């Protein structure tokens, strides 16, 4: 299976993962956004938008990561969580 196919399959598998801690969910979000949209754009949400700011930070951590590298990281993380 090529990388895009593996990424799409991992995206579907991620929907059925058992409950995960927020930090793991934020990692999944940040890697997914980097894989699909590239580097974060726009301004960081305001200080009272806690969820938006956390998501922005999770994505920002991946700045500079190539989209294919992010796709592979996402597949690897989903595989790790599914096997746990």
Q: Where are the model-predicted features located?
A:
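A charge-rich, low-complexity, intrinsically flexible signal that marks solvent-exposed coils, linkers
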Residues: 1-84
């Amino acid at each position: 299976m090529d990388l895009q196919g593996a990424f799409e399959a991992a995206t579907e598998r991620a929907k059925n993962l058992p409950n995960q801690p927020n930090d793991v969910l934020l990692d999944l979000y940040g890697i997914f956004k980097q894989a699909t949209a590239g580097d974060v754009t726009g301004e960081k949400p305001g200080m009272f938008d806690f969820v938006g700011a956390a998501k922005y930070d999770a994505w920002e951590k991946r700045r500079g990561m190539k989209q294919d590298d992010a796709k592979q990281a996402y597949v690897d993380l989903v595989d790790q969580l599914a096997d746990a």
